[in-house]
Amino acid sequence: MFTLKKSLLLLFFLGTINLSLCEQERDADEEERRDDDEMDVEVEKRFLPLFLPKIICAITKKC
């Protein structure tokens, strides 16, 4: 009975450590994805002001 309790306690402990490591990796992956998304937004912000006047000029033909 005592060895069974030790084995179960060891499995629970190792499972808890494994779960916490997986959560840390998942959090790190999510942070990397957020960085890429933020970079895309910055590129879009820089792209739009450069070409918006040219697009409006081409549509209205008032240059």
UniProtKB/Swiss-Prot annotation:
Protein origin, superkingdom: Eukaryota
Signal sequence region: 1-22
Residue ranges annotated as propeptide in the record: 23-44
InterPro entries in the cross-refs: Antimicrobial_frog_1 (IPR012520), Frog_antimicrobial_propeptide (IPR004275)
Tissue expression summary: Expressed by the skin glands.
Recorded GO CC terms: extracellular region
Cellular compartments annotated: Secreted
One Pfam family recorded for the sequence: Antimicrobial_1
Cysteine pairings via disulfide bonds: C57-C63
Keyword terms, alphabetized: Amphibian defense peptide, Antibiotic, Antimicrobial, Cleavage on pair of basic residues, Cytolysis, Disulfide bond, Fungicide, Hemolysis, Secreted, Signal
Any one GO biological process: defense response to fungus
Family, as annotated: Belongs to the frog skin active peptide (FSAP) family. Brevinin subfamily.
Function: Antimicrobial peptide. Active against some Gram-negative and a variety of Gram-positive bacterial strains. Active against fungus C.glabrata 090902 but not against C.neoformans 201211. Shows hemolytic activity against human erythrocytes.
Protein's name in the database: Jingdongin-1-MT1
Organism: Amolops mantzorum
